[in-house]
C-alpha cells in the first residue's frame, strides 16, 4: 500500500481552481505607466536594471485596457481625480490599485482645498506604499504584498462557475 501512495503522491497534482488562477494572476502583474508627481521618478527607477521588477512578473503597460494594476504615484488634485477614476474604469477586471507615496495615501503636506486627501476617496486602494517619495525597494515590497493578497483571494467568486462548484 505504501508503494501505491508514493506513486500517487509523486504523479498527481491536487489543487483548486482558485489557487491556479490566483497563482497565474499574481505572477503576471501589468501596471499602467502612470505617474503624477515626484513618486513617478522612483516608480520608473524601480523598472530599471538595478531593481528589475520584471523578475517578479511586473511589466509596465502603456494603456489602461492592457493593465491590471494602477499605481497612483503622487498628488491627486480634485480636478484630476475624475480622470484617474475614468482610467480605473477602463481597466479590465480583476484590477488592483497601489497608492504610492504620502501624497497619494493622505494628501501629504498639501492640505489645501485643491488636493484630494487620499486616493481611497475615488478608487478602492489595495496596497499602500508609504514614503516621500518611497524608495524602489518599498514599491517592490508593495508588489509582493499585492501578490500575497491576490493569492489569498477567491478567483471564482461571483462567476457562474462559482455557483456550480460551491456547496
Swiss-Prot record:
Co-factor binding details: Binds 1 [4Fe-4S] cluster.
Requisite cofactors: [4Fe-4S] cluster
Keyword line: 4Fe-4S, Cell inner membrane, Cell membrane, Iron, Iron-sulfur, Membrane, Metal-binding, NAD, Quinone, Translocase, Transport, Ubiquinone
UniProt GO MF annotations: 4 iron, 4 sulfur cluster binding; iron ion binding; NADH dehydrogenase (ubiquinone) activity; NADH:ubiquinone reductase (non-electrogenic) activity; quinone binding
Broad enzyme group: translocase
Catalytic activity: a quinone + NADH + 5 H(+)(in) = a quinol + NAD(+) + 4 H(+)(out)
Topology within the bilayer: Peripheral membrane protein
Chief localization: membrane
GO biological process: aerobic respiration; electron transport coupled proton transport
Keyword NAD: yes
InterPro entries linked to this entry: NADH_UbQ_OxRdtase-like_20kDa, NADH_UQ_OxRdtase_20Kd_su
Subcellular location, record wording: Cell inner membrane
Secretion signal span: none
Binding site for [4Fe-4S] cluster: 38-39, 103, 132
Function: NDH-1 shuttles electrons from NADH, via FMN and iron-sulfur (Fe-S) centers, to quinones in the respiratory chain. The immediate electron acceptor for the enzyme in this species is believed to be ubiquinone. Couples the redox reaction to proton translocation (for every two electrons transferred, four hydrogen ions are translocated across the cytoplasmic membrane), and thus conserves the redox energy in a proton gradient.
PANTHER family: NADH DEHYDROGENASE, NADH DEHYDROGENASE [UBIQUINONE] IRON-SULFUR PROTEIN 7, MITOCHONDRIAL
Subunit organization: NDH-1 is composed of 14 different subunits. Subunits NuoB, C, D, E, F, and G constitute the peripheral sector of the complex.
Family: Belongs to the complex I 20 kDa subunit family.
Stored NCBIfam families: nuoB_fam, PRK06411.1
Name of the featured protein: NADH-quinone oxidoreductase subunit B 3
Species in which this protein is naturally found: Rhizobium etli (strain ATCC 51251 / DSM 11541 / JCM 21823 / NBRC 15573 / CFN 42)
Gene symbol of the encoding locus: nuoB3
